[in-house]
């Protein structure tokens, strides 16, 4: 297969929106992280719910992970 015959790869996400995605995703992730910490500090061992803890931490880690991914893409570290 010839190199000229191949089509150039284009990103599914426009690089112009990397800064906006970074800020929004990291802000949402930090909100859920703060909520998780406040929940852990203010609840007693009798009122804690493992499902709620896991759900909040999963959502926080997903948003923070994708936020860091777009931060790396924004600064030019293409992963």
From Swiss-Prot:
What Pfam family does this protein match (any one)? Ost5
| Coiled-coil zones | none
Q: How does it sit in the membrane?
A: Multi-pass membrane protein
Q: Give residue spans on the Cytoplasmic membrane side.
A: 38-54
Residues assigned to the Lumenal compartment are 1-16, 76-79
Q: Which residues does the record list as N-acetylmethionine (modified residue)?
A: 1
Q: Name one GO biological process term.
A: response to endoplasmic reticulum stress
Where is the protein situated, by its record's location annotation? Membrane; Endoplasmic reticulum; Cytoplasm
Question: Care to name a GO molecular-function term for this sequence?
Answer: oligosaccharyltransferase complex binding
Transmembrane segments annotated in the record for this chain: 17-37, 55-75
Q: Which PANTHER family match?
A: TRANSMEMBRANE PROTEIN 258
The UniProt family comment states: Belongs to the OST5 family.
| Functional description taken from the UniProt entry | Subunit of the oligosaccharyl transferase (OST) complex that catalyzes the initial transfer of a defined glycan (Glc(3)Man(9)GlcNAc(2) in eukaryotes) from the lipid carrier dolichol-pyrophosphate to an asparagine residue within an Asn-X-Ser/Thr consensus motif in nascent polypeptide chains, the first step in protein N-glycosylation. N-glycosylation occurs cotranslationally and the complex associates with the Sec61 complex at the channel-forming translocon complex that mediates protein translocation across the endoplasmic reticulum (ER). All subunits are required for a maximal enzyme activity.
Q: What is this protein called?
A: Dolichyl-diphosphooligosaccharide--protein glycosyltransferase subunit TMEM258
Organism phylogeny:
Eukaryota, Metazoa, Chordata, Craniata, Vertebrata
Q: Which gene does this sequence derive from?
A: TMEM258
